Amino acid sequence: MIKKIPVIDLKQHQAVSGKSGMRDTYQPLRTVFATSSNPVEIAQGLKLNGADEMYIADLDLIESVGHNINDVKMANTVLPVMFDGGVKNCEGFEFFLDYAFKIIIPTETLESIEEMEKIFDKYPKERIVVSVDVKNNEDSLCSSGQYR
């Protein structure tokens, strides 16, 4: 069975859309699944239309300009959420476990390979998703610049 896992980005408590990662130009998302860009309303519409899970990236948290963590927690009550909040280390991963079904470890924000190893040693594998970030056709493996 193929799982349907839609992806939304959050910025200032709204689902947003944009192109090419130019986050300052992102606009509120317009979708057939909801009448607004409210992430919980969108999660409800996605669930009614057969989504199995959803992937949410909190752009404010990733950019350290705020957060949408309560919106993520509420959406997770509607549909299981894989959450990308820009995990940097094992402590950050642990914090997010209360808010989502699975936590994304993005290689672009991770402090080191050792932090990823700590996470894999400490937490159930079914709660972990690794996102390998690529920019300019190169892997972005850890914010420290490490590559292994």
Q: What does each of the following model-derived ranges do?
A:
Residues 42-47, 72-73, 93, 113-120:
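Generic structural signal for well-ordered alpha-helices
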Residues 51-70, 107:
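Glycine-rich, proline-tolerant flexible connector loops at the mouths of alpha/beta enzymes
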Residues 22-44:
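Short catalytic helix/loop segments, enriched in acidic residues and glycine
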Residues 3-11, 54-56, 81-85, 103-105, ...:
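Hydrophobic faces of well-ordered beta-strands that scaffold small-molecule active sites
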Residues 77-103, 118:
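Catalytic cores of alpha/beta
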Residues 66-73, 145-148:
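Charged helix-capping and loop-helix junction motifs
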Residues 8-17, 45-55:
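N-terminal glycine-rich anion-binding loops that anchor highly charged ligand groups
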Residues 10-13, 17-27, 97-148:
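Conserved anion-binding
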